[in-house]
Amino acid sequence: MFFSRGSLGTVEFAFTKRDGGRSEGNFASLNLAASTAPGLGDEFSDDPSVVKRNRSILAAAFDVPHIVAMTQVHGSDVVFVDGATVEAPVADAMITDQPDLGLLVRAADCTPVVLADPQARLIGVVHAGREGLVKGVVTAAVREMRRRGATRIQAWVGPRACGLCYEVPAEMADAVAAVVPEARSTTSWGTPALDVGRGVIAQLKAEAVHVTDIGEGVCTIEDEAFFSYRRQGKASGRQGAIVVLRPAGDRE
Ligand SMILES: [Zn+2]
């Protein structure tokens, strides 16, 4: 179920992989997204009731009554979840100060990021693909946390497509590198590519965020322990990252 699970003070988080759920076929087994290819028909989508069970399995593993996931649109909007919101906000980053509320970000080859400032009691998740990288969604999330009082933000960057696999047209590589030079890469076969994870990490470091690269050396396209849009096509599931803020005083 978990590729990596960790904690920092009262903050607990994990990055998931494919195993441990109930979905079948391309979605086997811990698929966390019901509508991965909207409008393409049932064969491209997992059974929503099974996805709900998968999310319940994750909620149980973290002992949280609710998990909030976003309707991710490759944008840069940041939503603050105040606890009243249990429906999926349309955004690619969300922040909360609510204890025992799971924040979930989902990705196949995009970069999932967990943010936390345990002292300020603020946590967040970010979904950053190529478009989110260019639009600066990670930077926007960090700045929103600071605006709400965060001073020492830690980021964990999860498994994603690596820069040796994520081939893109030359013009696209140029356009992204014009905004985030660190994201420029070359595939193992010598063609233009992007390393979105490296770009995201550069953006975090530019904001003086302390970064732990959980996904270093891992590639969702190459490793079948993960879902991959590039490897599996439109009918692919989504892994995710979850973060939970525990009540103050619960533990050190
Ligand atoms: Zn790779």
Where are the model-predicted features located?
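Active-site microenvironment for binding and transforming phosphate-containing groups
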Residues: M1-E252
